[in-house]
């Protein structure tokens, strides 16, 4: 499941790419209306994708009366991103070793077994298998 966006990104509003725009003729002595009045364009807020909403939902399932600080949420988000990157990198290497261009659930499962220690790997594999089975049955 991809991370959910924390903020909305402003749309580009139908602007053509820089190379495709029609040539505009300007007179040397004139400025545009915005430049003449000294107004600057406001930049839209950049979109930040996090796992915060998903972490919060899991927290409420496990401990409905417990909250979480922004700093703790940030740490957990970094943790999830780190584990995701490690698993994806290892799965990519496994696919390359086997001369495959697609990462399947098998590569993910093997990379989880290689990265996580002992009992934690077993639980992760069983939860992952359960999630894939649930997804496969609902997709039909």
Curated annotation (Swiss-Prot):
Modified residues (N6-acetyllysine): 8-9, 15, 25
A Pfam short name: Histone
Cross-link (Glycyl lysine isopeptide (Lys-Gly) (interchain with G-Cter in ubiquitin)): 134
Subcellular localization: Nucleus; Chromosome
Location in chain, cross-link Glycyl lysine isopeptide (Lys-Gly) (interchain with G-Cter in SUMO): 8-9, 25-26
Predominant subcellular localization, coarse grouping: nucleus
InterPro entries reported for this sequence: Histone-fold, Histone_H2A/H2B/H3, Histone_H2B, HISTONE_H2B_site
One function term, GO molecular function aspect: structural constituent of chromatin
Domain of life: Eukaryota
Alphabetized SMART domains for the sequence: H2B (SM00427)
Low complexity bias spans: 11-21
Role noted for this protein: Core component of nucleosome. Nucleosomes wrap and compact DNA into chromatin, limiting DNA accessibility to the cellular machineries which require DNA as a template. Histones thereby play a central role in transcription regulation, DNA repair, DNA replication and chromosomal stability. DNA accessibility is regulated via a complex set of post-translational modifications of histones, also called histone code, and nucleosome remodeling.
PANTHER family (UniProt xref): HISTONE H2B (PTHR23428)
Family (UniProt): Belongs to the histone H2B family.
Oligomer and partners: The nucleosome is a histone octamer containing two molecules each of H2A, H2B, H3 and H4 assembled in one H3-H4 heterotetramer and two H2A-H2B heterodimers. The octamer wraps approximately 147 bp of DNA.
Protein name listed in UniProt: Histone H2B
Phylogenetic lineage: Eukaryota, Fungi, Dikarya, Ascomycota, Pezizomycotina
